[in-house]
UniProtKB/Swiss-Prot annotation:
Protein name as it appears in the record: Fructose-1,6-bisphosphatase class 1
Subunit text: Homotetramer.
Chief place of localization: cytoplasm
Details of cofactor binding: Binds 2 magnesium ions per subunit.
Broad class of enzyme this protein falls into: hydrolase
Gene from which this protein is expressed: fbp
Residues that, per the record, bind Mg(2+) 1: 90, 109, 111
EC number: 3.1.3.11
Cofactor: Mg(2+)
NCBIfam families on file: PRK09293.1-3 (NF006779), PRK09293.1-4 (NF006780)
Cell compartment(s), UniProt: Cytoplasm
Catalyzed reactions per annotation: beta-D-fructose 1,6-bisphosphate + H2O = beta-D-fructose 6-phosphate + phosphate
Amino acid sequence: MTGQLRLDDHLQRYSETAPHALAVATAVDAIAAAAIEIADLIGAGDLADASGLTTGRNSDGDVQRDLDVQADAILRRCLGKLSIAALASEEMREPQIGDRAARICVAIDPLDGSSNIDINMTVGTIFSILPAPDDLALAFHQRGSAQFAAGFVTYGPQTSLVLTLGDGVDIFTLDRKAGCFRLARSAIQISEAGEEFAINASNRRHWDPPVRAFIDECLAGVEGPANHDFNMRWVGSLVAEAYRILTRGGVFLYPSDARPGYGDGRLRLTYEAHPMAYIIEQAGGSASTGRERILDLSAQSLHQRVPLIMGSSNEVRRVEELHCDPLLVASISAPLFARRGFFRL
C-alpha cells in the first residue's frame, strides 16, 4: 500500500484548482486527522472507556451516546483551528459562527450509526462543505447542489474515507502503520441497475403504498416487472449502506411513514441526506425523497428531516414513478391497502 497516492497529496493537487479549493482541502485534511483519532478511540472499545452508553439526548431529541459526544469534540477541536465561517453538527442546537471572512462552512454528523457500537458494527462520520454566503444565517439553508465537497468515513474492518470534491468519487483507506489515508479506489461508478435493496422491512405496515409497491416488485424478482431477483440488506448504519451501494450498487430506502415523528422521514437533510446525495450522484447514481431530487432541496431548519432513497438510478427512478402513480397516491388513505402484498395475507 505504500506506493499508493496519499490523501494529502491528492488534496494538495486539488487545492490549486479554484479560489475556494485551498480552504476545502484544509478542512478535509482536518476531518481526516480527526477520523484517525476517532478510529483509534472506537477500535479500543471498552479498553479506552469508549462505550456505547447513553448520556442523554441531543438537541434534536435523539439518544446521545458517550461516543457521539467524544467524536463531536474531536472534530470540533480539529476544525476549530481552521478559518471556517460556520460549523454545524448533529450534536449542536445551532451553528457555531467562526471567521466571517472565511470561504467555507462545514456540517458534520460526528458519529452516524452509533447505536451499532454495542454490537461491534460499522459506524461513521459524515461531512458536507459548503460555500460561505454573505449572510451566515443562510449558511445551512443552501441547496445540496451548492456543496463544494462531501464525504464520509467508515469505522469497520477497515477505516475508509469516501470523498468527492465535485469531480467524481474516490475511496481512501487508512494505512495504520503510516498514519495516513491512501487511495484505494478511484472514479467510483454505481451500476445503473442494482440487485440489492436495503430497507427496514419491519415497518412495512407503516409505509405509503408507493414504497410497499416497490418492495413488492423487488420481492417478485424474475416473476415481476423488475425481471430479476433481488437480495435484501439492512445494516441500520447510513455510512455502511452507502459504502455498499458505491461498491456493489443497489438501492437504500429510508422513507417517510405513518409512525408519529416519521411523517417527514428520519434522516437529516443538511448533514446526512445532502452529503450522501452529492456523493451518490457524483458516482453516477441518484438520490431522491421519492418525489424530489435531494440536491434540489434547501433546509428550512438545521435539523430538518427528509425521506431518502438513493443508489442505482433505475431503482430510484422506479420509486419516483410509483410515487406519481395516481392509483397508488389515491390509495394512501385507503386502509385496506395495508392488507395486500407479500408480507400480508
